[in-house]
A protein has these predicted regions:
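Non-catalytic C-terminal interaction segments of nucleic acid-processing enzymes
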Residues: 1-64, 75-170
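Conserved catalytic cores of phosphodiester-cleaving nucleases, focusing on short active-site segments
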Residues: 66-72
């Protein structure tokens, strides 16, 4: 694809937001920070992905290629690795079976907080770290930690780069 066509397609990015993301003030602020037009639709895995329009008008849903699974805290992530592990693993297994990449974005988290047990759940730091690293190895999952005020920008950057890589490889 020609660089001009790539730029045209990148200008058409629409952020896809899973319908299970609760319509809160925080979501509205996040969407504003993402900066792309947004569309709510059911995603098979993850909370955010993208859709682009190719130069000839064909819409391409990239949610089968990549998605971003957002967690608002280490505590929410820990629940996904403990009480909700079966459901969470199924979501990652679906993505892996489709060859999709999942970014696990955890707000207000760091490895230092995980290793130091600076969270409110009862899961031990070793168990939580082991689960996170096991998911990374098993599902080729990429964890990203950021402050909640940066989440929209991080999502925007992931979407833009994934869309650009997709277009450059057409």
């Amino acid at each position: 694809m020609h660089p001009v066509e790539i730029e045209q397609a990148l200008a058409s990015i629409v952020c896809l937001i899973d319908t299970r993301e609760q319509p809160t003030d925080a979501l509205r602020e996040r969407v504003k920070a993402i900066g792309f037009p947004a569309k709510r639709q059911k995603l098979n895995y993850g909370d955010y992905s993208a859709e682009i329009t190719l130069p000839r008008g064909e819409r391409v849903d990239l949610s089968a290629k990549f998605s971003i699974e957002r967690k608002m805290s280490i505590d929410e992530m820990a629940a996904c690795f403990t009480s909700q592990r079966e459901r969470f693993a199924r979501e990652f297994e679906r993505a892996k079976a489709n060859g999709a990449k999942i970014y696990l974005l955890v707000e207000n988290a760091s490895y230092e907080k995980i290793f130091g047990g600076r969270y409110r759940t009862k899961v031990t730091p070793n168990a939580l770290a082991a689960s996170l690293f096991a998911f990374m190895a098993r599902y080729d999952c990429t964890p990203i930690f950021c402050r909640d005020e940066s989440t929209g920008r991080v999502i925007r950057e992931i979407i833009y780069r994934e869309a650009k890589e997709f277009l450059q490889n057409l």
